[in-house]
Amino acid sequence: MLEQEKNPDMNLDIPQRILSHFEAAHKKRQNWETLWDECYDYALPQRGGFTSVPRAGQQRVNKVYDATAMDAVDQLASSLLGNLTPTWSQWFGLKPGPDLSPAEADKISPILEKAAKTIQDHFDRSNFAVEIHQCYLDLIVGGTASLYFEEAQTGELSAFKFSSAPLTHVTLEEGAGGYLDTVYRRLSLTIEQLRARYTQAVWPAALIQRADKDPQEQFKILEAVVPNGLQYNYYAILMEDMSAQELIAHGTFETAPVISFRWVKSPGEIYGRSPVMKALPDIKTANKVVELILKNASIAVTGIWQADDDGVLNPANIELTPGSIIPKAIGSKGLQPLDMPGRFDISQLVLDSL
């Protein structure tokens, strides 16, 4: 649970210090962005946007000719969801530890079982299944995923609220223990969303004026979760005025509010490696082969034609329709189809081997 500090005399150096650390971490992250973009382009094109800002409604599958990778990602994410955190099933439990005697364990077991079912009920009534599935997609494609575990508002069906932070919005750092416990997240929120999320914040007059003109305008926020001993400091910084960033929220968590995890970790690397990264050469090869097959098929259907330059046949006036009469000069071969050099069976053999 977040304990907010209401001291109006917050340290004015905090935004600059947090931004400095964020920029250093983001600079290290940029080494991954080209690889991530390539993985998402072929396996999860509706996400992505690491090296460019995608527009709403933008076509993102222009260079995808083979959907095998996209189908495989969806199937693996569904398998992880069904095997690790199945919906409406008891996928975790509580049991007595080894320090208790058998009599004490028997006495406390029913209490722990009841507590586990209560927690499971809150998971089932929350949006956990939807958000963890999005994390599995990021994990499979990008190798790293982050899940925000927050407290829901009073009166909601569940005490828990979850949100999957896309890899495009998250910058991570490892702590002393090797865990991904330092998290920077960039958000774009409307004034209504800002007031709902940061209830105690005092907003600049310039921001209020802009929001009055356009209530749907989104404002940039940087959230940071930084470990501090056994606790976690939380900061939210308004990023609109780059010359004077403002600290709009500050508090501490007893436990980490963000769960970040990796598929495979390589030595010396912060972010994880994914199955899509391993299969990327085969994915690109299959995509290129299917592209060439489609081009070859279009040529096979429509054909490529050649004609002698005999001064009679004008290619601009020729229509290849039933009943057409095509003029040609005496002794000329006229319009003739060009033999196809490609072989479809070779392309299929390549795909089968992949």
Give residue spans per PLM region.
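Globular "head" domains of long coiled-coil molecular machines
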Residues: A211-P215, F219-Q231
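Generic structural hydrophobic/aromatic packing signal, biased to beta-strands
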Residues: I119, L147, V170, I221, ...
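Extended, helix-rich architectural segments
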Residues: M1-P215
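Primarily cytosolic, helix-rich juxtamembrane/linker segments of multi-pass membrane proteins
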Residues: G175-A176, I208-A211, P227-N228, E246-I248, ...
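Generic structural motif
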Residues: L157-A159, F219-I221, Y234
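A generic short-segment signal for beta-strand/edge and adjacent turn/coil regions
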Residues: L112-T118, A129-V130, I191, W203-I208, ...
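Extended, charged amphipathic alpha-helical segments
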Residues: N233-L354
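Short, flexible beta-strand-to-coil junctions
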Residues: I140-V141, Y148-G155, A224-Q231, I237-S243
